């Protein structure tokens, strides 16, 4: 079976890229190991996604947003960073922009369901259930072999198969990996004080605690800690964990109770050394797997999908080869310029704030104090969060 574009991975970025390319009329195949019914009813995995204004605009433009219940799109009005034992904190507010908020929060499973629904009316998109066993990047076309032995070919293969991408390995693209040797634990909590739509990131001794505002009096709790301590937390009963959270938060949200199942994820940062090869491109976490402290992974995935869609669409309109190495190198260059500074900055901050040596603690306090005074830098970051889709 021949396609113009083959996308490996039916997550929101892979499906989103397919939806962006659908108006060109090109023939698109999406290979996904899960059956369609599981994509349509993606389960709650506990993860909440911070969505920038630009990403929100892309979701609206390409038909994802209408498939998400309005009550499940939560306002992110402000964000604050707190360091235990420091009187200083760092605030990010819409006062530094022309918006009423700095973004939105949407559950990952709603994004997955919406992306699946957004492609249902696209006659030029095929969803193929299967697992890739081999990849051949030829001069004139790429060939993907499925575990069943079935072969699919395309002018371009785009891999959106997670930060642990097997397609990336098959293409021979190396990565810079940073294993934080930590566990990220997420669950919903209820509390008797309003969160006021403010996200909070608090760095404590030995762990990081974030609360992400959802419906009022409900938040998503995100804990990152060493693997062994994380296993201990997972073994606690709900009441015992709630008491620990009350102590860690100093009851800033009032009394807290655990209101959902706990989910745990290993914490690994990944940055591909190239985002492309001949007839091949990386999307989403397969290209850039961010530390969750950045809250920017999904946004970077959508930005990358938009960039690649613009480049490939332009090539089609001009009769150019969409799998050309030079063409795809343009995608690598543009997406690297968008992602590299925040990726490196986030990792540096994460390393600093998970280091409990006295010198590191002193530096942390100094950064928060300086950050309060560096108003121009803070405004630049808020502007990045609140910028809109340039084509919307």
Give a label for each model feature.
Residues 60-61, 66-68, 72-170, 178-183, ...:
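Conserved N-terminal helical subregion
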Residues 3-30:
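N-terminal Rossmann-like FAD-binding beta1-loop-alpha1 element of flavoenzymes
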Residues 310-392:
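C-terminal helical "tail/cap" subdomain of flavin- and related membrane-associated enzymes
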